[in-house]
């Protein structure tokens, strides 16, 4: 067996050689370019750097987009080779057993010499903004990329953790189904969402991504392979795995809830012209006030200014069910490369001053924000929504998050939190007005994303890192309260207006507001709170019990260790604040 595994790894190295070469060539090209610039420019070095910083759209257009395209092809080729040619007889059980055996081998090392466990998945393949230092850990390869089974009768998809959202969409939609919670970013993985968090426009009906997971298959710190469900002996672990970020075990498969779907989504765009109006609309259309409210399948709000917003209601639709010729003449595939970015399309409806209806193909609806990475791409390529750019270069968008992380330098890493903001925050929906006011004061960045979402009280005492919602916020006659994701992305308005901006103060104020109203920060983004403040925001009571029960202490980093920024964001933020004054 050992010899077979050695041959397998050797074959893998040979077959993945093109990917390795591509990676090295890109690194070398970047290093040479920087060296040439540094040598030739001499006294003009700093002005040149300033020019590149102020015109980064050109850099992305002529370097990042083509290189990202090649890079993505190399990654896809590597995965394709692994799936199709490396070991055609490989089974899920065999792959899991190999991971289990690696963990058991690690367990034989004297405790004093052991490093904590983590996956060997490179940092640049994750969608987080941070770079956890994996060199301090014992890395376990998790080469699990397969959809294992679709149980059409019980509407359950069984898949391995590295399957991406795009792959699932392409698999399920032609069959007439979709995930109950399907993230809009195609490169997100099912496992990353399971051990992190996911929320979409269907979440006002079913809750967070974790609520749609019926079963986890996990390799524990002592090398056991266990099935984790809410109704078996591992129920405590079941409720702690979400938001754990790989600090309680290694995920090797999961089972997800699937819902029947139709070919189209019938979208209604409703404009709002005051803050009170859109706040009341979100409460009503989400069913937060009344459990009998007939809610749409999809609900989303895009807030373009303090008093202007568009609320989108979406319902599954087929042509035969909607004979309205006017509506069916407006089928809009919003993901075509030459079309306006989705949020710009929404903004045009707001500017027109009237409500609008149209049909969007289901797959395009599910990935509608992928091309512009919501609206982050505008900060990278200010001219990216220009019709000429879309026509000739739109098919290259977006630059792959993996490539952007892969080419991140220390300076660019600082910019991700000092000159930009990437935050998703779970907050009680009845505080939406206060959320918008605070985000405006701190970041002055538009638009803002709002997805309503149920947070459940599972009636079991401690229920993982998220507390049960207070009874005062629970929708009468139910076991859930309506929260929402507030998404803030892009360059703070203060910096665009050349005004003083302190990223440290802004982020710490936002985190304090979140704690005060009983909310939670998504942990993919940089945190500025200390460990004590972190434990005020999240309930780690059950988490700590589970870590002890499953021998995680010493075997995996703690949650705070895993997700805290690898750089001193507070000190760096203060330095940038002084520069902006």
Task: Place the predicted regions along the sequence by residue.
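A short glycine-rich, hydrophobically flanked beta-strand micro-motif that places a catalytic Asp/Glu
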Residues: 118-121, 297-304, 420, 425, ...
